[in-house]
């Protein structure tokens, strides 16, 4: 399944999503930053989707991210590193359930499944 939508994050969403950070001194400012504007939530699927998306995103610290990744090219610092990516399939499933309703996700036959995979390419 796949999906995409604009989301206005609120305190409850962020407290749940970043529950492992609530006691950190930067958490309040992180929440304030993330609630300033809507964010784009995207659900992707595919072979090794979590690992492939994480390659595109880059290291959490933009200074350590490889050139050409989203964080290296577009982020300034760790607290505002521009993008979140799930670290595992299990985490992704929890995050999808947190931010998307079932009717906001779509299942369809991809062209790659129809043509490339049948040919063994």
What are these regions (language model features)?
Residues 1-121:
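Non-catalytic terminal and connector segments of soluble metabolic enzymes
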